[in-house]
Structure formats: C-alpha cells, structure tokens
From Swiss-Prot:
Involved in the regulation of glutamine synthetase GlnA, a key enzyme in the process to assimilate ammonia. When cellular nitrogen levels are high, the C-terminal adenylyl transferase (AT) inactivates GlnA by covalent transfer of an adenylyl group from ATP to specific tyrosine residue of GlnA, thus reducing its activity. Conversely, when nitrogen levels are low, the N-terminal adenylyl removase (AR) activates GlnA by removing the adenylyl group by phosphorolysis, increasing its activity. Residues 1-473 are annotated as: Adenylyl removase. GO terms for biological process: regulation of glutamine family amino acid metabolic process. Residues 479-981 are annotated as: Adenylyl transferase. Gene3D superfamilies: 1.20.120.1510, Beta Polymerase, domain 2, Glutamine synthase adenylyltransferase GlnE, Nucleotidyltransferases domain 2. Belongs to the GlnE family. Its EC number is 2.7.7.89, 2.7.7.42. It catalyses: [glutamine synthetase]-O(4)-(5'-adenylyl)-L-tyrosine + phosphate = [glutamine synthetase]-L-tyrosine + ADP; [glutamine synthetase]-L-tyrosine + ATP = [glutamine synthetase]-O(4)-(5'-adenylyl)-L-tyrosine + diphosphate. The keyword Nucleotide-binding applies. One of its GO terms (molecular function) is ATP binding. Coiled coil: none annotated. It comes from Mannheimia succiniciproducens (strain KCTC 0769BP / MBEL55E). This is Bifunctional glutamine synthetase adenylyltransferase/adenylyl-removing enzyme.
Length: 981
C-alpha cells in the first residue's frame, strides 16, 4: 500500500549511485545486488530504507543531501535509541563553530538528520506514537537552547554581559508554548515562543553598555533568524512570537516584572488558555529564576478556587471552534475539523482552567498525563477517557505521517492516490504505549481509503460527542415553527393561490402581491434546479419558514425580501451558513433588521457570507472596538494564521475589514454611533490596516533585499501621509485612501542583510510598490482599499516615494494652490515619532508661508468653478450633496482657504487637518464668528450624515433640490463673503 516497487527501487539505485560517488572505497557495484536481495526484507537496512523512502519524500531528500548519513543508514537502520541525547550531541557540534553561517548550517543539518531518523522509526513502527512526538519536542528544545546559548556568548562579546542592578548575570529564558510546551510537537510544527529575562539593568564589559531589554531584544532577533530563516540548507523551525504580551506590537523580550504586571492587569482568558502549555525550555531545576518565573505565572493560569467565571469565556471559545468548523467546512482537517485534535485539547484544557487551581494534578503540560488525572477526578468517565485517548493517538499518527511526507505543516487529508496509500499503510498497524508505557501493537481494519475514512470518522464522532456534552447550551430561543404559515413554502405542490392567501393573512396589500409572488416563485424555481445536497435541503426547508415569517413581519418587507432572497441564493450550496442562521435565531433576526435598513450590508453579506459570523453577538456588533483596541483586535484575528502564508494573511485582512465595517455600519444604523464617530471609526480602522500592510510589505521586501544600511535598530525611515478624507479623519463607507509615501534623505547607500543588494532609493520604491500591491490585490474577499497616489509631488509623473527634502522643495517651489489646499487635509498616518514630527514641521512651514491673498482667492475660486463646470449637467431638480454648490466641496474649500489665508500670520491655525476643528480654531482666533463656525459645522455634519445614510442604502449622494435649502443658502453667503467681498 505504498509507493510502487519499481519507483522505490529506482530511488534506491539513485541513492546507491550517490554512495559509490562519495565513498568509492567502501561501496562498489555489488551494492546493486544487495538492493535486489534485500529490498523486500524490512529487517535489513536496505529493506528498512525501502520502507522509509516509500513513506517520506523528505527522508529521500535528506539521504540525497547528506551522503554520510546515507552511508550510516545503509549499514545500520536508525533505531529510537539513536534519537536521544540531542542537547549533548548538538553541543559537541557547536563547540567549534565560530561564525553564524556555521551555526545556521549546523542547526539545519542536525535538525534534518534527526527528523529523518524519527521518520524512519515512525515508518518502521520501531517507536510508539507517543515516543515520536516526545522526541520531536526534545529535538526542538535542544536546537532552540543550543542556538540560544551559542548566540548569547556571541552577543556578550558584541554588547557586553547583561546584569541586574546587583551585578547578577542575566540569561534569556524561553517559554515554549502550544505543542512544544506539552511535549507534543508535530513533524513540521511551527514553534510558539515567549522571551523573558529576570530583571532590568545594563551590560558590563563593553565600551558602550546597553540596557538589558535592548540586549535581549537583539539576542531574540538573532535567535529567531537562526531558527526561522530559510537558507540553502532549509530552516530549523518556523517561529511565531505572537503569543507574547501585546502580540506583534509588544516588546520582543520582557523582564519578569513586566511579564507579571501584564498578566495580572491585562491578561485575557485566551492567554490563560494558551499559557497552560507554557513551559520553560532548557530549565535547570536548581536555577532560582526558573522557580521565580513559574511562581509568577501560576496565579494567572490557575486560580485558587474552582474558576466558574471562566466558563462563559470557554463557551465563547467553544462557539468559535464550532463556528469555524461550520464556516470553513473543515471536513478533512484532522486538527481543526469536527472531532479533531483541537477539540480534544480543548476538552482537557477546560478542566485545567476551571479546576487546576485546586487540583495540583491538573497543573501539567502533557495531554496524555492529564487524561487519566481528569478521569480520577470523575470529570470524565473511563469510556470517555479511552475514546479521547485512542482518538488522539490515531489522529496524531495520521498528522505526523502526513507532515513527514514533505516536511510541510498540513492537517488536510490528501486527495492523491500515493499519499492516501501512505496513510492507509501507516494506520492499519502501528505501536503505542500501554498503561505501563510498554509498546503495544495497534491494529485497525484498514485496507483501503474507505475503511480508513470510516475508522477516522468513528474516532471523530466520539470526540465530538464528548466535546458537545462538555459545556452545554440551552437553546431557549429555538422556535417551534409548526404553526408557521410558511412551513410548506418549498413543497412543490404549494400553489400560487395558497401563497397569495398567506400574504393576505400577513397584511400584504393586493397591489403588491403579484410582484412578491413573482419573486418567491423565481426563488423556488431556482432552488429546485440547484444541487444543494440532502442536508442542505433539510436545513433550507427549516430555515425559509422562519425567514419569511420575519420578513413579512417587517414594515419594509418589499425592500427586504429581494435582499434576503439574494443572500440565501448566494449561500444556497454552502450548508454551513444556512445552518448558522437556522441554529442562531438571534443572528437571523439581526441580519433581517440590518438588511431592512441597509443595502450596503445586504450586498456585503451576499458577497462575503463569512460576515454572518459577526451577527452571533449583538453586543459586540453594536459596540465597535474603541480606537485603541483596533490593533489588538486585528492581531487577535490574525493569530490563528500561519505566519508564512502571505495570501491567507492578506485575505484575512480583507475579512477583518469587512467584519469591522459591518459592526460600524450596524452601530450607525441602530443609532449607537453619531456621524462624527462613524468617520472616526472608519478612519482608525483604515489606519490599523495600513499599519499592518506596511509592516507586511516591509517584511516581504527586507526578506529579499535586507534593509537600507543607514537605518538604526528598528527604524524604517519611512512615513505615510494620509490626505483627503483619511487625512481629515472623515472617511466614509466607500472612501478610498489618498496616500503619499516619504522616506529619509538618502545621499547614497544600499541595502544589507538580504539575498540581493539594491540601491536604498530603489528599496523604498519597491516598498511603495509592494504596499500598493497588497492593498489592490484581488482575493476571494475582494480588495482591501482603493489607493490613490495622485497627490504626491508631480502627481502621476512623480516617483512613488520621495524624500522629505524633495517633498518640501516641491511644495515650496512648484506646487499649485490646489496642492496646498490638499496639504491642509494631510497628516502622518504611519511612521516613527521623529518622522511624524518632521512631516508636521514641513507641513506647517508650507501652509504658513507668506502668500498673496488676492491671488489665493482667485486660485481657490477658479479651481472650485472649474470643478463645478466639470460635474455640471446633472438634473436641476436634484442636489448632489458632495459636488453641487452649497455642498460638501464648498465647505471643504472654505476650510482650506481659511488655513492658507491666515496661517502665515499664525502657524497654529495650520495644526488641524479636519474641517470641524479647523472651524473651531478659526472661531477661537476671531477669523470667523462663533455663530458662523457652529453653522458651518452643523451644515457639514448634517450633509455628511446624509451621505453615510445614502451609502448604507446603496444610493448615490443625491437628494431633491428642496432638501438642505437653508444649509445651502448659508454656505453660499459665507462663500460670497470670503471670495467676492
């Protein structure tokens, strides 16, 4: 049931050729006869190699790359006893290494060879399932600590030795999280780490001391590179640091005190859940710092009482797991799917969180040690214990076999014949520990893919049963639809006359019935011709009566019906979304309420059904994050993603934007947010995403080219200025982003630390191009934002990124008046504090430069008239809120003119970039009256509020000419006063 024999034989012949080439004195042509003789005898080294290469392409690759290792395996099959003493053996190899290049190669060669040995042991069943993931974890720990210790010595030579205020030498302590912490690592797991050190202080023994945090941050960066960087020898481990305090925005290394303060004051329940697995790697039990670190973390993880307060958080986590299974259709994912590894881990960790404070036996990291303890406490039955144990070991066997094939982090069942055969062969018989930790043979009735899948599903069903019973949900809102007039809506024999009767009963007027019946009949016809499966049809049959009952109970049923039917048609073949609406009545009600009031929301949900998930929590829906919470929410959203999957990362950014936009729109529609706050939220959302996009672009560009040599530490030397509505903190639902990219002045120089060296100027152009590419990339979730760069110096003819000096020179000497008007509505939206201050000084200097007031009036007036002529030709009976005279554009021009006219006398008048505060400051300084300022602000917010409302309805910003007549009249008076008197 593995690779066809001729293919294996050909692979062995190629390996034999390799041996003869590298070791002609030890191997000759007789080796080919040995292949013929022993290929079918798994007890011989050649037969064992046959089995190993048939099960793993990764093993084949390592044997080809490492001839000495191949020679060893040809003479003697690796055994589990050979997969031991990792730290000691690695230490010997690292002892003579003097350069980082040597460190990188040694780590990777050691890792690959030892992983290949474990894969061989796994393929030959010479190690149990448990022994494999324990050894994988021990190997990872040895590599991490070996690299840390080597780099620590080098760092001390470079920057001095870190000490505390009493002169005690400080070391970097590393918490291994997740499967690494629980001695449960997979073949191709990434590793989750947290760096910490005992106390603040500074280095000694260096001409230029640095503080401990800087030392350990630099050391941590070097360690991550040593483990994570991909070289010609591969990588050691994909390294994820996002579980540290404050995530990506937090310091890379924190002192013990800072760690304790964070977890006591800000630690969240999901961080408690994650920290259960946290284990100090390479811990010396005689080290007092090890004891201190454990003591400061324990109260955060384990409460001294039975912690029922966490149950709601666990319910939320459980709901998220269930929704993700539904939403993503994770049928063949053995980790994340229903009844998968994650659910077993969740079951165990629930009991640890709730009872671990009182039950010391639950304060462990290893799942297999915890299961019997949970049974002893009568928290699960003996049968449930066995069901979970056997399922876990079977699933972990499948997972490790899958990942050992190509050294890739996957939990998806294969679709190709070869890899299915490998799984069948690996799972019909293998070894695991008995109750006394002795190997025992496990056999399953697996002989083809169907029987494998049947065994897998049996395990998953047992896990799901325990998972579902663990934290119950009382669905008190479950509706009884037996009396629902729409119960038979999808029955083929329901006639139009009967539908008309139902509509009449529900108050639909006679003149509207034909139109509505036509829509309903078209929907029924569409459904009858769609292939949606048995389960899909069952769910739809239950859902439609509930949906129609609520639609026709709403006064806006005529508008609502086509919107809701469109959504249902879009999700018709995706049963998971139909189930979500059926099983969550509140979500259905919420969706109907929002779609009745917003075409935009209805369109977004129809295009991106993943947004339905946001409807499950009304409280969260009506309360968008506070402005400072946006980065943390986005980080939390991205945590579940593999760090090296850029496409998935970019798609997730778009999904986060859509989900948050939905929350803002919902709060707007339902009156929870005033118009000014809506724009604030939309602006801060855009800025949060912009920060993430720039950082992602920076990572991608620096991974290839390194970074400009003039930069220090974590500097980027790069600033993004927001113009227009972004600059004015006035974004709307459909606004694009007007951006200008600026960089440090670079007289010469190039990049360092990358695979390819380029000129520093070219680096920033590449960075700008990458940012634009990420924003505009079309994925299944749409694009992120439309980006407009035409306001940069020289417009479309200018470079995508220019220096601050070039920007200032252009604005001072070449910019037109309209470009200075645009500068009024600009502000720094990304960049280091020093660069933001620099931009603001340049901006203020330009806006406060002396200018001819008469010419300024002429320029502003002519530009407005030119714009009006360009947009003329519309219906005279309509008022375009944005473009027509007396509208938004006039108010914006008034604000810009006031700044340009009066900032030369008082530069403080140029401080604000938003119209409302510009009018406030002008009134404060007597430029306009308080009454004029209030009226201008009221006109502006009223017009913007109407535009927001029309956006939500999916309509253009056009109303009848009678609307806003007073506002238009007042704006015209101000315009005449400023530009014609």
């Amino acid at each position: 049931m593995t690779m066809p024999l001729p293919s294996i034989e050909q692979t062995l012949i190629q390996l034999a050729d390799n041996l003869i080439t590298h070791f002609p004195e030890q191997f000759n042509s007789q080796i080919y006869q040995q292949i013929q003789k022993d290929i079918s005898n798994i007890k011989t080294p050649v037969g064992a190699l046959m089995r190993a290469v048939s099960m793993s392409d990764f093993v084949t690759e390592i044997l080809q790359k490492q001839p000495h290792f191949l020679a060893e395996c040809w003479h003697k099959t690796p055994q589990l006893a050979d997969c031991d003493s990792y730290a000691a053996r690695l230490s010997v190899q690292l002892a003579d290494i003097r350069e980082e290049t040597g460190l990188y190669k040694t780590l990777r060669d050691f890792r690959n060879q030892e992983m290949a040995k474990l894969s061989i042991c796994q393929s030959l069943n010479s190690a149990t399932v448990e022994e494999i993931f324990i050894r994988l974890s021990q190997l990872a720990e040895a590599l991490i600590i070996g690299a840390r210790d080597w780099l620590y010595q080098r760092a001390c030579l470079d920057w001095g030795t870190p000490t505390d205020n009493q002169g005690n030498v400080q070391q970097l302590y590393i918490l291994g999280m997740g499967k690494l912490g629980g001695f449960e690592l997979n073949f191709s797991s990434d590793i989750d780490l947290i760096f910490t050190y005992p106390a603040n202080g500074e280095t000694v023994g260096s001409r230029k001391p640095i503080d401990n945090q800087k030392f350990f941050t630099r050391l941590g960066q070097r360690l991550i590179s040593a483990l994570d960087e991909f070289t010609e020898d591969g990588f050691v481990y994909r390294t994820d640091m996002r579980l540290r305090p404050f995530g990506d925005s937090g310091a890379l290394a924190l002192s013990f005190n800072a760690m304790e303060s964070y977890y006591q004051e800000q630690g969240r329940d999901w961080e408690r859940y994650a920290m259960i697995k946290g284990r100090i790697l390479g811990a010396d039990e005689q080290d007092p710092n090890v004891k201190t670190l454990r003591q400061l973390l324990r109260p955060f993880i384990y409460r001294r009482y039975i912690d029922f307060s966490v149950i709601q958080s666990l319910r939320d986590m459980k709901s998220k797991i269930e929704r993700e299974v539904l939403r993503r259709g994770l049928v063949d994912n053995i980790k994340l799917g229903a009844g998968g590894i994650r659910e077993i881990e969740f079951i165990v960790q629930v009991f640890q969180l709730i009872r671990g404070g009182r039950e010391i036996s639950l304060q462990q990291h290893e799942l297999l040690k915890l299961l019997p303890e949970i049974e002893k406490l009568n928290l699960i039955t003996a049968d449930q214990h066995q069901d979970l144990l056997q399922a876990y070991l079977f699933l972990r066997r499948v997972e490790n076999v899958l990942q050992a094939i190509n050294d890739k982090q996957t939990q998806l069942l294969p679709a190709d014949e070869l890899n299915r055969c490998r799984l069948i062969s690996a799972t019909c018989e293998f070894t695991q520990w008995d109750n006394n930790h002795r190997p025992q043979k496990i056999q399953y009735p697996i002989h083809d893919w169907e029987s494998f899948y049947q065994v897998l599903q049996q395990h998953q069903q047992k896990v799901r049963s325990v998972f579902n019973n663990l934290i119950g949900f009382n669905n008190e809102n479950e509706a009884d639809d037996s009396d629902n007039a729409w119960s038979d809506f999808l029955d083929a024999d329901l006639e139009q006359g009967e539908i008309a009767d139902i509509l009449a009963q529900q108050g639909v007027s006679e003149e509207e019935r034909d139109e509505i019946i036509g829509r309903l009949e078209a929907f029924r016809h569409s459904v009858s011709h769609r292939s949606i499966g048995i389960r899909g049809r069952e769910v739809l049959t239950q859902l439609m009566p509930l949906l129609l009952l609520q639609i026709f109970s709403n006064k806006k049923y005529r508008t609502l019906l086509p919107r809701m039917l469109n959504i249902v048609e879009k999700i018709l073949t995706r049963t998971t979304y139909l189930e979500l609406l059926l099983e969550n009545p509140q979500a259905l009600t919420q969706l109907i309420e929002l779609c009745a009031k917003s075409q935009l929301i209805a369109e977004q949900v129809a295009q991106h059904p993943i947004l339905l998930d946001e409807l499950l929590d009304r409280e969260a829906l009506l309360n968008p994050p506070s402005f400072e919470q946006y980065p943390a929410e986005l980080q939390q959203y991205l945590l579940r993603l593999p760090e090296d999957d850029d496409e998935q990362f970019i798609t997730a950014l778009r999904q986060f934007k859509q989900a948050t936009l939905l929350r803002i729109a919902a709060a707007d529609i339902l009156g929870a947010l005033p118009v000014m706050k809506v724009s604030d939220h939309l602006t801060f959302l855009a800025e949060t995403i912009l920060h993430t996009v720039v950082n992602l672009a920076w990572q991608q560009i620096t991974a290839r080219f390194g970074k400009p040599e003039h930069l220090q530490n974590n500097e980027k030397g790069f600033l993004v200025a927001g113009y227009g509505k972004l600059g004015g903190i006035e974004l709307g639902y459909r606004s694009d982003l007007d951006l200008v990219f600026l960089c440090d002045e670079i007289h010469s120089g190039q990049t360092v630390g990358g695979k390819k060296v380029i000129d520093s100027h070219q680096f920033y152009l590449r960075l700008a191009q990458k940012i634009i590419s990420i924003f505009s990339m079309t994925t299944s979730a749409g694009i992120l934002y439309e980006v407009d760069l035409r306001l940069r110096p020289s417009g479309e003819a200018g470079p995508l990124c220019c220096s601050f000096k070039a920007f200032e020179d252009y604005q001072m000497n070449e910019a037109w008046t309209w470009e200075k008007q645009s500068l009024v509505r600009s502000r720094a939206v990304y960049g280091e504090p020093a660069l933001r201050e620099k931009f603001e000084l340049i901006r203020t200097g330009i806006l406060a430069s002396p200018r001819d007031l008469t010419q300024l009036k002429i320029d502003v007036r002519e530009m407005r008239e030119k714009m009006y002529r360009h947009f003329a030709g519309a219906d005279d009976n309509k008022f375009n809120i944005k473009k027509d005279q007396g509208g938004i554009t006039d108010i914006e021009f008034i604000a810009q003119y006031l700044v340009l006219a009066h900032a030369p006398e008082n530069p403080n008048l140029a401080y604000w970039s938003d119209n409302v505060r510009i009018f406030d400051i002008m009134a404060e300084h007597g430029i306009i009256t308080l009454n004029e300022a209030e009226k201008l602000k009221n006109c502006y917010t009223g017009l913007r509020n109407q535009i927001h409302h029309l956006n939500l309805l999916g309509e253009p910003p056009i109303v009848s000419k009678e609307e806003f007549a007073d506002e238009r009249r007042f704006i015209h008076q101000i315009w005449q006063k400023l530009f014609f008197e």
